[in-house]
Swiss-Prot record:
It is found in: Cytoplasm. This is Ribosomal RNA small subunit methyltransferase H. The keyword Cytoplasm applies. It is an enzyme of class 2 (transferase). Keywords: Cytoplasm, Methyltransferase, rRNA processing, S-adenosyl-L-methionine, Transferase. It comes from the Bacteria. Belongs to the methyltransferase superfamily. RsmH family.
């Protein structure tokens, strides 16, 4: 891993081991990031196995080309710079219509958080950006300065689950009428000013939920995850597995719902048997989400909210 792209991988062994790797299999890392999961997965493949890695951040791919060089030299890795919502189309274009396993590590990678100018962090002063893909048109600046009041309230409440969404949106509306809100610090101060004093004494940064909401909106994170996970489940071969790491309740709820729909069947009462086309196509590998160990939590503070869910395809 290069110094410029330092990232501590969360739930490394659990995420990959639960995929039950076949040495000659075809696998996908939908969220390359710091390439930790990819490196561990590749170590389990034979030279006949192959890994396709997606990331919309060129820096992640540049870093992986250094850290995974030995596997690249053997022709075991293909990098795809794109949003994982286009996963099915991009794999199909490469002649891949079936995979043995796929993993997702959702959310923002450490290097993106730590790179001040990306504007993801409320702890560092930077221009309001928050784009995972630096070529994408919509920025956090656009959301904060151009979205109507009602739209701000909606995304703050829906994606940030912040009960002071209206007050924060009103404070933003008042401030931007005087001059544009340009930096993360300006925005964080406005959020603080909109909240009651007793709220500011609570654990955690008062701007955390609103920054999350804006980031999700800028990158359409939930829409992309929904599309991509459904496509991935279609692409999986029989006995293929999918591992998904989430970092907040919205992502976890989405993953849990998609897995539940595929692993349960809703049949009318009194039906003597379940028709073949109504039987579940997946089963849950673990009934409850897998959480980081105490050792991992002690070593990596960013692992605290991580949850891993795994499902296996049992019927085509």
């Amino acid at each position: 891993m290069t110094k410029e792209f330092h990232h501590v991988t969360v739930l490394l062994h659990e995420t990959v081991d639960m995929l039950d790797i076949k040495p000659n299999g075809i696998y996908v890392d939908a969220t390359l990031g710091g390439s930790g999961h990819s490196a561990y997965l590749l170590s389990k493949l034979s030279e006949q196995g192959h890994l396709y890695c997606f990331d919309q951040d060129q820096k992640a791919i540049d870093n992986a080309q250094v850290t995974l060089k030995s596997y690249i030299d053997k022709g075991q890795v293909t990098f795809i710079k794109d949003n994982f919502r286009h996963l099915k189309a991009r794999l199909t274009a490469l002649g891949v219509d079936e995979i043995d396993g796929i993993l997702y590590d959702l959310g923002v990678s450490s290097p993106q958080l730590d790179e001040r100018e990306r504007g993801f962090s409320y702890n560092q002063d930077a221009p309001l950006d928050m784009r995972m893909d630096r070529q994408a048109p919509l920025t956090a600046y656009d959301v904060v300065n151009t979205y109507p009041f009602n739209d701000l309230v909606k995304i703050f409440f829906k994606y940030g689950e912040d009960k002071f969404s209206k007050q924060i949106a009103r404070k933003i509306e008042q401030a931007r009428a005087i001059k544009p809100i340009e930096t993360t610090t300006e925005l964080a101060e406005l959020i603080k000013a909109a909240k009651p004093a007793k709220e500011l004494k609570k654990k955690g940064h008062p701007a955390k939920q609103i920054f999350q909401a804006i980031r999700i909106e800028v990158n359409d994170e939930l829409g992309a995850a929904d599309e991509s996970i459904q496509d991935a489940m279609e692409l999986l071969a029989l006995d293929g597995r999918i591992s998904v790491i989430t970092f907040h309740s919205l992502e976890d709820r989405l993953t849990k719902q998609l897995f539940k729909e595929a692993s349960t069947v809703d049949v009318p009462k009194g039906l003597p048997f379940i028709p073949e086309d109504m039987k579940p196509t997946f089963e849950l590998v673990s009934r409850k989400p897998i959480l980081p160990s105490q050792e991992e939590l002690a070593a990596n503070n960013r692992a605290h909210s991580a949850k891993l869910r795994v499902a296996k395809k049992i019927r085509k």
